[in-house]
Amino acid sequence: MKKISVIIPCFNATKYLPKCFMSLVQQTIGIDQIELIFVDDASTDGGATWNMLQEFERAYPESIIILKLEENMRQGGARNIALQYATGEYIAFVDADDFVADNFLLETYEKAKESDADIIQFEYFYYTDRLGAVDSGRNVTPEVIKISSVSERKKFLISEKVTYGCWNKLYRHDLLKKAHTSYAEHVIYEEPLFVYPLLYFADKIVILNDAYYYYRQNDAGTMRNDMKQEETLKMHADVQLAVWNFMKKTPFFQEYYDEIKLYFLHTYLYETLYFAKLRGFQPSYSFYKKLEKTVLAEVPDYAQSIYNALIPKQMELYRMIGEGMTEDDFKGYWERL
């Protein structure tokens, strides 16, 4: 068994893929200790991405698996397929336009083994070709989070110490098998459906302030452009609704209802609107009303929470829902958001 499987979804990726590849094969843990799974997500570059992946496989046939999808499934679908092939003790995810420090896998693996962690979360740099690496600006305190009771998990869940992105973490493979989580497919912002449920299954999470990952900031990036469109903004909400529906089927839903509700209402409604605001894009009133309709159907007690004091901005929105938000009300709220 390899120590770590690293999954890399690729779509028309030849511009940055070589740098990503070299950062992985030069890992100080040793190429023989890792399994790299590259997935060509139905690239449309005339076979250029696939040809490059074939070259990688020929160079390291014992450590590289390449998969070619006939249908574009976006990053979530590509990762789901790759997980079916992964054999490593731990799992990591790297995007094809990003790269990692050469000690990334060795240090995170050693810390995972030393602490018997289910999840290791680490820090990252932003990266552009013009500026190089830029500190993320996150102020993180290293911590070992042990969860052995319901009250401890509740406290952890509202602490927001763990982010919902997938690539700044190392995961115990057995944890993923136990949780049966998967990524949302054919959408952007696919990661929460995979990451959020894991927080209910993990019993030990290690937070590091060491940065190993270089997250490329690309103006042509999928997320940045797509979130300016109402159709793809809806994908964000749909993924959060999928998280809610997943959690309803778990044994955790009743015991952690307040925490799951807090997460769902924040991400499905408030965060969807806030993301649009950040991108200078105002969705239509009809778009908002569809979100509101789902909230009323799924969470009739949306305005009642033991955590109300923690979310004043969200509570303003919830109060306006209760009063019957008109189109003029929505425009006014948007200006204040």
Language model features with spans:
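Membrane-interface aromatic/basic loop that binds lipid-linked glycans or pyrophosphate carriers
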Residues: 117, 276-337
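Glycine-rich, basic loop-to-helix element that forms the pyrophosphate-binding segment
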Residues: 69-86, 96
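Acidic donor-binding segment of Leloir-type glycosyltransferases
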Residues: 21-68, 113
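Short aromatic/hydrophobic "clamp" motif used to bind/position activated sugar donors
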Residues: 91
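A conserved hydrophobic helix/loop-capping motif in glycosyltransferases and polysaccharide synthases
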Residues: 4-16, 20, 27, 39
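Cell-envelope/extracellular polymer assembly enzymes that use nucleotide-activated donors
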Residues: 3-5, 35, 193
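Catalytic core of nucleotide-sugar-dependent glycosyltransferases
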Residues: 212-219, 225-252, 271-300
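Donor-binding/catalytic cores of nucleotide-activated saccharide
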Residues: 96-208, 215-231
